[in-house]
């Protein structure tokens, strides 16, 4: 608050992970990966930027509030909580480790990559799409494209863009569930096998969405917004589809049930879900392509981690749309990245970041999706069509 200078009342500014570590140890430190998302860290020096802090001094008085930076993998201190005896199994004091406390930093540390030439998509409600570099990309072009240089484990840079994830799908399912649709979770559990089968059977690229549209950000009423925003895609044909109201079976022979059994027509549901999945794969294609252009890299594989990695159709279409193999999993990449960095910090594991990733690879069920050359033209056409409408 510029007028009241409330920062004058504070002694130290800590982000939430650092506050938790402070409560456990009494040591005030700022973990680097999370600090880098504040815009106050120099991405090259990997420390607070004195020029930026100086500029904030007169208006906000925050220059003195930030404690020293600590790299992920360093030990903050020993856990000391009044009234609790916190000891290891060998009776030693319990160390508190600064992991990649920004969740994407730990997720990228947990990517099961075999080489350093990879791109990643951390796919949850939102998607973080980018690559891992040894130095930041500080070009005007990268800034204009809304890419950021978030800092990572072991001196790395997470060069990435924050784009749409599973949010639109989640909102549609929530809406259908409120109308009593059991498949969408009205009974408390989403019937993913049924929804996945119906979505996969629906016509590809029948409708397309610009997943960066601000109109898709707000909660509520998502189904109607999707239908109002989509454009006819490249996959329209005269063959039967899930929109054909004369049949209870789609073109792949998957039963879609009775459209009158609830307030939700399964044919419409499948069409909407397919449009969302196709459009998200197209958004991933565009983000990966822009990542490569701006960073001068060409990944050998795309690692799809997080909840979106469970979506087989999305993984396959991302491979098809980008022309790059997609390795899906682990779902809990953030937890694994946290774990392996902690294990190395206390001496249970050792080696480089790639050695830690070998632990992730050996501990995870992964699925590889190769790009299908026969689908390349469809995605080129879809990309051009959407580009013409933007």
Q: Which residues fall in each region the model found?
A:
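Active-site core segments that coordinate phosphate-bearing ligands/cofactors
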Residues: 1-27, 40-42, 46-55, 86-301, ...
